[in-house]
Amino acid sequence: DYGVTADGIVGPETARLLGINLNDQASNDLYLIAKCVYAEARGEPYVGKVAVAAVILNRVEHPDFPNTVYGVVYQPWAFTAVFDGQINLEPDETAYQAAQDALNGWDPTYGCIYYYNPETATSEWIFSREVVVTIGKHNFAI
């Protein structure tokens, strides 16, 4: 209807039509959170996608982590998707919606700053964290 191909990817033209300005910091944060959500939680239920976004935002507010979305996402070894390059995939509309819901204050993790898949996690340290909630395949912890 708007001359945009429905391919599930929000590129620059689609973002423009959705009213997302990729040139301001809030939009850059939304885009980066959506990229991380898409890369880290593609197969998870919607609430699990929002939860991943919420963890990013909780880290931004936590004194033990960088105080920017960029700093949190690109902190060394913080996210598998950065290490393996999946962060470079273009997010779909659902990832944007999940990121926006978290930015609007929805935190299904109740303040968690960690998450992991217990079936694939390789760091023994992560298993020492107190699990607050499990959503989909991820444990969310403090």
Regions found by a protein language model. Name each.
Residues 25-142:
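Bacterial extracytoplasmic/cell-wall-associated proteins, especially those involved in peptidoglycan
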Residues 1-16:
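Short acidic, glycine/serine/threonine-rich helix-capping segments at coil-helix boundaries
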Residues 12-30:
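Intrinsically disordered, low-complexity Ser/Thr-rich linker and spacer segments
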